[in-house]
Design a protein with these regions (language model features):
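Glycosyltransferase donor-sugar binding loop
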Residues: 145, 199-217, 233
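Conserved donor-binding/catalytic core segment of Leloir-type glycosyltransferases
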Residues: 167-183, 189-195, 201
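Short hydrophobic beta-strand element within catalytic cores of glycosyltransferases
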Residues: 263, 268, 272-275
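Membrane-proximal helix-turn-helix segments that form the acceptor-binding/catalytic region
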Residues: 100-118, 219-220
Length: 371
């Protein structure tokens, strides 16, 4: 088998990228990761197929629903799977998750074990997958963003502020993400109440609608937010960089993250990063952010607003972090992973052909007929 994956080779590798977000629910980080992966591979001259039933050199799974499962069961090519979530990610995201978490964990473990290799997006996910005791290799491949896309352009700041009715001279703290308990909506609003002279903007909505944990409570909380809060709702991804350009710092009070793509997006925009002090962030972002909690967020944001030297220092640190997670580096890393997985899968199948996929495919298809 020719395992060359260099973009200047005559033969282009074919990657079948699987994501149920293409014609499904958007407005969340997994869809963003899919877009960034797709675009990075295309820039690297890879032949990217989306949700294809045609043969490919390798299949790269981004989501873990039933459609992705069917693709995996019918695959003849090697499979790599991006692990964006662990069981803990479900609590505070989806309704009654604590009740059905054991079933979700069982399915997640089954799903991940169908891959030839699992690509964990952060050390936190590596640890979570370790607790699940998977039987397949796990490798750390962090998320990435196209840094150029998020660098502010002339006019963006003024245009967005005018559209949103924000004072041109106001200090703006922005959060980008879903509205759900896990994301720290309560801390965001309480901090806004304590800082009436700062404008707080939340970009993102509830893409899963009534499946969102505490959906009605979230709706009431947003409706009762103070006047210095702006909730933009679901926003086309191409417009998100403009909202970062209109802000002065990122305020990301999420209580649980496996990575935090919004952090890298904001860093690429040159914003100081005010984050909750989570164990997820330190191995990824080092000392490039200001850590806080519910009691200290207002004080941290005030220091960014009032201390120009501090603000400038953390702007530089943010840009340095963004460069580390540029999507062009992701493409290079993925190409190397594909090569290794393809070589290993070929060797393993010559030694012991895997027959489980046809059997599971038959069982799954038969189950669907019985429904």
């Amino acid at each position: 088998m020719d395992t060359s994956l260099h973009k200047n080779e005559t033969t282009r590798r074919v990657v079948n990228l699987i994501s149920e977000t293409v014609d499904g629910c958007k407005g969340h980080g997994v869809h963003t990761a899919f877009l960034q992966t797709r675009d990075a591979l295309l820039r690297a001259n890879v032949d990217v197929r989306i949700n294809s039933s045609e043969p490919a050199d390798i299949m790269h799974i981004q989501t873990m629903g039933l459609r992705s499962l069917r693709h995996m069961l019918g695959a003849h090519e090697p499979i790599v799977l991006a692990a964006h979530i662990v069981p803990e990610s479900l609590v505070g995201s989806f309704i009654l998750a604590s009740v059905w978490l054991p079933i979700g964990t069982w399915y997640m473990r089954l799903f991940y074990n169908l891959a030839d290799e699992v690509l964990a997006v952060s050390p936190e996910v590596v640890d979570g997958l370790g607790r699940m005791q998977l039987s397949v290799p796990v490798r750390l491949v962090p998320n990435a963003v196209e840094v150029r896309r998020f660098q502010p352009q002339p006019g963006w700041r003024a245009q967005i502020r005018e559209r949103a009715g924000v004072d041109p001279d106001a200090f703006v703290a922005i959060c980008v993400g879903q509205i759900q308990p896990r994301k720290g909506l309560d801390a965001f609003i309480e901090t806004a109440r304590n800082m009436p002279d700062v404008t707080f903007v939340w970009v993102g909505g509830m893409p899963f609608q009534r499946l969102t944990d505490h959906y009605r409570q979230m709706m009431r909380t947003v409706a009762d937010a103070p006047a210095n809060c702006r909730f933009v709702g679901d926003t086309p991804y191409d417009e998100v960089p403009q909202w970062y350009a209109a802000a002065d710092c990122l305020f990301f009070p999420s209580r649980q993250e496996t990575f935090g793509l919004a952090v890298i997006e904001a860093a690429a925009a040159g914003l100081p990063l005010v984050l909750r002090d989570l164990s997820t962030y330190r191995p990824l972002f080092d000392d490039s952010y200001l850590a806080g909690d519910d009691e200290s967020f207002a004080q941290v944001i005030a220091s960014v607003r009032d201390d120009a030297d501090l603000r400038g220092s953390y702007q530089k640190r943010a840009r340095a972090i963004a460069a580390r997670f540029d999507a062009d580096r992701l493409a290079e890393r993925l190409l190397g992973v594909y090569t290794e997985v393809m070589e290993r899968a070929e060797t393993e199948r010559e030694r012991s052909p895997r027959r489980w996929r046809p059997m599971l495919q038959w069982a799954f298809t038969d189950w669907r007929r019985r429904r």
